Amino acid sequence: MVKEFDRKIILEDGQEYYGYGFGAHNEKVCEIVFNTSMVGYQEILSDPSYTYQAVVMTYPLIGNYGMADDDYERDTPTLGALVVREYNDEPSNFRSTATLSEVMEKFGIPGIYGIDSRKLNRSIRDFGSRKVLITDIFTPLEEGIAKLKSTDIPTDAVSRVSCDKIMISYAETQKYHVVAIDCGMKMNIVRSLNKRGCKVTIVPWNTPAEAIVALDPDGIFISNGPGDPTDVPETIQTIKNLLGKYPIFGICLGHQIISLAYGAKTYKLKFGHRGGNHPVRNLETNKIEITSQNHSYAVDADSLNGTDLIVTHINLLDNTIEGVKCDKDKVFSVQYHPESAPGPQDSAYLFDRFIEVMEEQNNA
């Protein structure tokens, strides 16, 4: 007996894709995006940068190794929804403690499988990211489109996923003190800093500069996070007030915030960069790094003219800015994720560079 479709997604332009539900069976309006990673769905599910987004996985089989307690990037996943071609509800992995569907149901994340994910991804590629409704199969198309038109994607994503109080992560041997501004930080970033001898004090996204100064850091880190960087003017102002006072390192949203603090501008990409195989050229070494990426916005290259920033990395797929620096202020940032999780580790040296800059500052 053929199983009947019970869920569907509706795009703003009226396209419908039918499939089967897994995870939570609630209705949601999200921004639809795609990720080209073959593995790492648990890290994607728990990456705060995907807040309010429905992620379409281009790799067809998802769920086959289950969910492991030690592999979450944050304890409370905030992904909007997950769309896959084929879902495996019987994982084979000795580390697995739950199925993907069980975790999604626990956190209210709807999923749909059985759709033509290649066709859907081509639509996103050709027409860009846009709003999508994940709903019941019986929802009329007209009603679905009306919901899409009347529902805005919230702009409070960073405040939703940031910590609400100061937290500290200690290293075994503590040589440096890093204050990390949490805009939706992945825990592998904290682990990467701890591993290099950094005590990490994690502060909320809207912590003012004077409060950070009072913590007496050796360096400041600005994390990844969801949404439009212009939605966090408080964080931008904090960085403006700290430029030139401490070594500063930013990743992803943190990279965009640093650029805005120097007077540059950002813009939204047609469909973003999401995956574990994006080639980036390091302009200082002329080497190619394969990087993990997850972002909807990029720094406007022309807007860097007249600022103190210089470009250090570019994306080889579309020539967008992937890294900037200001040597006199001991500031640098990258658009991609050197901590991976998931993805390659070609760029882990950037954490070592941050250590070197803090050491130089301490010895000055």
Report residues per predicted region.
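Catalytic beta-strand/loop cores that center a nucleophilic Ser/Cys/Thr
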Residues: K287-D329, A364
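Residues that mark the start of a beta-strand
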Residues: K175-V179, K199, P247, I290, ...
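RNA-binding accessory domains that recognize and position tRNA/RNA substrates
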Residues: M1-E210, A214-L215, P229, A341, ...
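Cysteine-nucleophile active-site neighborhood
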Residues: G219, N224-I290, S296-A301, G343-Q361
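Active-site glycine-centered loops adjacent to acidic/histidine catalytic or metal-binding residues
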Residues: D116, C252, H295, H337
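Active-site-proximal beta-strand elements of phosphoester/diester hydrolases
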Residues: H177-D182, T291-S292, F332-Y336
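Beta-strand-turn-beta hairpins that frame and shape the catalytic cleft
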Residues: E172-V178, T285-I288, C326-V331
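Proline-centered loop/turn at the N-terminus of a beta-strand
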Residues: P110, H177, P247-F249, K265, ...
